[in-house]
Curated annotation (Swiss-Prot):
GO terms for cellular component: extracellular region. The lineage of its organism: Eukaryota, Metazoa, Chordata, Craniata, Vertebrata. Antibacterial peptide, that adopts an alpha helical conformation which can disrupt bacterial membranes. Each caerin displays a different antimicrobial specificity. This is Caerin-3.3. It is found in: Secreted. The modification Lysine amide is found at residue 22. Belongs to the frog skin active peptide (FSAP) family. Caerin subfamily. Expressed by the skin parotoid and/or rostral glands. One of its GO terms (biological process) is defense response to bacterium. Disulfide bonds: none annotated. The keyword Transit peptide does not apply. Keywords: Amidation, Amphibian defense peptide, Antibiotic, Antimicrobial, Secreted.
Amino acid sequence: GLWEKIKEKANELVSGIVEGVK
């Protein structure tokens, strides 16, 4: 569903931010 896609994108963004901080 739409919410699953939103959560998936949010997880990708968080992962990208975490990788950038490392």
